[in-house]
């Protein structure tokens, strides 16, 4: 435990203090006491940076039509067993008003990935209406998949503040096993950079427990988030 205590103290005191091997060691802890110590150290860092607060966001699921065919996803294009839906503008704005009435200060607009001028303009209208309804006080996060730089810029100009685009895994090899050949890991990473370029606060994420995933893969995910400042 002494070695672990020293490692946790260093990690808590200085950002980006851990090597890949040290991250693998922490991810592989099995002793209940050591796991509790790790959780306590992580919670202390969380409290130091963001306090003992819980932030609530209203999520509006606008549709489950998606151009992607990711093997793990229930709304993948090739899944013929799921009923498809797309909310119209009136339904989305009704949900927006409901969230405003509940005094949510942050909204997430989420759907499957659609790349078309019609969809881009639809989201633009929704964003401008949210700004109008909320008096500019509502933070808006989009989770709408991979898009062009022009589309990202248009949505940012219309009032979006944040964007969530999960990388799913930072391992190109593991990514390739989870997606068809026409799904590009490099394109995914490039979209994260484009979002930052367009002025978004960018969020991402990974899946844990994937078949074939290793602790080294998970350590790589943490370093990926560090390197891209996510």
Regions found by a protein language model. Give the residues of each.
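N-terminal pre-triad scaffold of radical SAM enzymes
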Residues: 39-77, 84-110, 161
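Flexible, acidic/Gly-rich N-terminal and inter-domain linker regions that tether
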Residues: 1-68
